[in-house]
Amino acid sequence: MFSSTYLLAIIALAVSSVFAAGPTAVPLGTAGNYAILASAGVSTVPQSVITGAVGLSPAAATFLTGFSLTMSSTGTFSTSTQVTGQLTAADYGTPTPSILTTAIGDMGTAYVNAATRSGPNFLEIYTGALGGKILPPGLYKWTSPVGASADFTIIGTSTDTWIFQIAGTLGLAAGKKIILAGGAQAKNIVWVVAGAVSIEAGAKFEGVILAKTAVTLKTGSSLNGRILSQTAVALQKATVVQK
């Protein structure tokens, strides 16, 4: 009987030989400079660990909650023991507000770019139940909620791309993970989600989330990629690493 590692190697070879490299990458613009970017608020239940910058606009710094912020001497950014990088908000000193306005605009543009791509390679595949599945490069589209109650694999090379268009909600069950195989990289995986996103306790998520609404990472969960939300991001002792 073949091992799972051997089978994944065979699938990786098939992907590189048969499937296209995936859709054209989504241009994030200056929104890509942030591990977390949101419009309405970013909250944490300490201790969370964020590697990268956190930006908030048009909401003010009072909506950066749970971080115990320390303002810089310039008044243009703050720091937190939970964040490796700067935190900025719309009411900070010049030029921060204009930088954030541009980033928020770029986030909206990226969302539209990803959400309106046509001609999906995979339409309503697995009816949105991704647990146990293997996903090659391509453009995926669902008009319903998408979730995983078991681990699943995203497989492809380091230059391949994925766009997952989701009209409903997105969820990853507690303790489950997305496995990257064949060299696939989180920075090349885009989840464009119209509904709420919930990464349950202890789950491990991979990719860039472009969210129309709220994103929640529950206790002990982690994300490699970025969270770009048009409303709010809530972390509960979670880890976010910008990729």
Curated annotation (Swiss-Prot):
Residues 1-20 form the signal peptide. The keyword Signal applies. Keywords: Antifreeze protein, Secreted, Signal, Stress response. Changing L172V: Has 66% thermal hysteresis (TH) activity of that of the wild-type. Pfam families: Ice_binding. InterPro entries: Ice-bd_prot. GO terms for cellular component: extracellular region. It is found in: Secreted. Induction: By low temperatures, 0 degrees Celsius. The record marks A40, A232 as: Ice-binding. It comes from the Eukaryota. The keyword Ribosomal protein does not apply. Optimum pH is 5.8. Belongs to the ice-binding protein family. Binds to the surface of ice crystals. Inhibits growth of the ice crystals. Has antifreeze activity for survival under snow cover. Has high thermal hysteresis (TH) activity, which is the ability to lower the freezing point of an aqueous solution below its melting point, and thus the freezing of the cell fluid can be prevented protecting the organism from ice damage. The TH activity of this protein is 2.0 degrees Celsius at 0.11 mM. This is Ice-binding protein K1-A. The gene is K1-A.
